[in-house]
């Protein structure tokens, strides 16, 4: 995910990526986003139950515009979030409108994207390109693949030199076909959604069992 953010949306060293304090790129990548972008900064935006808000994003974008401060270039949001919550279509489009109005691109960390589509019972396009997302890292391992994620560009211009950035970042395997082939079976007949619905059902079953324990409650509604 850290390299997908860099590879899909090249960011200048003086640029900044907006995320929230629990975002995977912030807490679980050992500074890799900054490393792969030669020094760009992660700016933390307020969030509500693990979700960015358009108001919070706007506050960070407009906080400072002087040359002494990193220039916001990208907003990255995670669907489903690290806390198990979901962005609905209106929430994604609201954030995207703010970003686009100020010249920022929108990146989606879709490690659990299949779970979100299954839970929201919507078309994948409704919460991606139709809502203003420029690129998504479409998660494969959490759908059951042994390895591999797929980067999809909805803004085609961003992908013009993707192969070079991918190669430079060490993401071009000598046997790439072995990473690519499992996707054919995963996407056939909506297997990815079948797996996601099953995973969601098991998560709901676990949540219900925990909630039934005296004194136990779920941290967030998911």
Which residues are covered by each model-predicted region?
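General beta-strand structural signal in soluble alpha/beta enzymes
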Residues: 19-20, 44, 69, 77, ...
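Conserved PLP-anchoring active-site segment centered on the Schiff-base-forming lysine
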Residues: 10-27
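Active-site-proximal loop->helix
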Residues: 28-38
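Active-site C-terminal subdomain of aminotransferase-like
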Residues: 74-81, 86, 123-222
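Catalytic PLP-binding core of fold-type I/II PLP enzymes
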Residues: 87-118
